[in-house]
Amino acid sequence: MIVDSVSQKPTTLVQKTINIYLCGPTVYNDLHLGNTRPLIVFDVLNRVLKKAKYTVNFVQNITDIDDKIIKIAQQQEVSESVVTKQQITAYKSLLKKLNILPIKHIQITEKIDKIPDYIDQLVNQNHAYVSTQNNVYFAVNSLKQYGYLANRMVHLEETDTDKKNKLDFVLWKITTAGIKWNSKWGLGRPGWHVECAFLIDYCFKNELTIHGGGVDLKFPHHENENALHMALYNQPITKHWMHIGHLMIENQKMSKSLQNFLLAVDFLNFHDFRVLRWIFYQKHYLHPIDLNQSLIEKANNDIQRIAKTLNVARTWLVYSEQSELISPKQYDPVFSALLDNLNFANAVAAIWKLIKKINTSIKTKDFSVLREQLSFLEWSIDLLGISFKSIHTKLNVRLIKEWSILHKQKAMDKADQIRKKLIKKMLL
């Protein structure tokens, strides 16, 4: 079940094929931490849907032509493709570092030659017009549903540009700067809003299940995408909307324009990727998160606590000779929480309750119960994308078994020497 962020209504996903479109980056520089929140939230959604036996088609655009890209290319005296190729490589590397499951990426430049025909349909239906300077604009007053997403009324406002209405937005921009494409209106480039609307139409037609992005995209970007689709098909561009809350610093949205951002790659140079993911699980995805040092430290401590629980539990199962073929097992309290509109609070609470039970089983040496509890924990953290690689190497397992034998033989001095080694290795 998800709650539509526009209608505010809960919806059960009935169809077994789920089509997702998440607005992607404009690749002119590196992502800041705020940009990663939608990626991580939608990655969990993707994991949950797949575990629930849905077929998921997950598409994300990469905007690889834009005024910012052209400006940087000119400053560096290179082509736009040199800039974007470097940034796309960096972006995909970041996705791997964040443990994001594979997404189908489509670069806008790969499909631009098809966009003029899409725009021409809007012109022919009188939803778009060609200006005196041969730019093509969408006429917002041609669509009575315009303003639906943002819940605002649209009034005709005069403008001193070649647009008829201040809110009209560009579909095709005539330009002499940077890379250009041919069209019946002249050399130029498509506008940002029409790029996403076209890609959704190209990939899914009228079958998009969930459209997502940061809450700041709700207006004007998603409003304008939706308007284009409504104009052509007389129905919304997607069945459901998911908007992700801001990442804040000192009560201000983290953004490049405010110069209050921290690059994701810089954060990951000092912190485990699991720390960032865990931070985003501390609030519902709709709500803003205020990033501060205490939150980072708490998340770091939490991740270390989870890792230690896994390591110690595995060690005791080796000790008790019950460590063979432990496979992750579905844990309903975590799964149910995430199926309920990604209720991170309940999922996290369920994990802490499970860890408490694991510690009790270790104390009481109830190893058969511990074995099942560990399989629950491994399944749960995999669902959240924060799994750990086992540190129980052959050498470490041999050391644990040696400790086990000495401990059971009551050779306490020798056993304690090995125990200290195990503690140092984070195995106890």
Swiss-Prot record:
Cited InterPro entries: Cys-tRNA-ligase (IPR015803), Cys-tRNA-synt_Ia_DALR (IPR015273), Cys-tRNA/MSH_ligase (IPR024909), Rossmann-like_a/b/a_fold (IPR014729), tRNA-synt_1_cat_dom (IPR032678), tRNAsynth_Ia_anticodon-bd (IPR009080)
Protein name: Cysteine--tRNA ligase
Binding site for Zn(2+): 23, 196, 221, 225
Superkingdom of the organism of origin: Bacteria
Subunit structure: Monomer.
Localization: Cytoplasm
Alphabetical list of SUPFAM superfamilies matching this protein: Anticodon-binding domain of a subclass of class I aminoacyl-tRNA synthetases, Nucleotidylyl transferase
Cofactor note: Binds 1 zinc ion per subunit.
Binding site for ATP: 256
Motif annotated as 'KMSKS' region, chain positions: 253-257
One GO location term (cellular component): cytosol
MF (Gene Ontology): ATP binding; cysteine-tRNA ligase activity; zinc ion binding
CDD domains: CysRS_core
Keyword Cell division (UniProt): no
Reaction(s) this enzyme catalyzes, per UniProt: tRNA(Cys) + L-cysteine + ATP = L-cysteinyl-tRNA(Cys) + AMP + diphosphate
GO BP: any one term: cysteinyl-tRNA aminoacylation
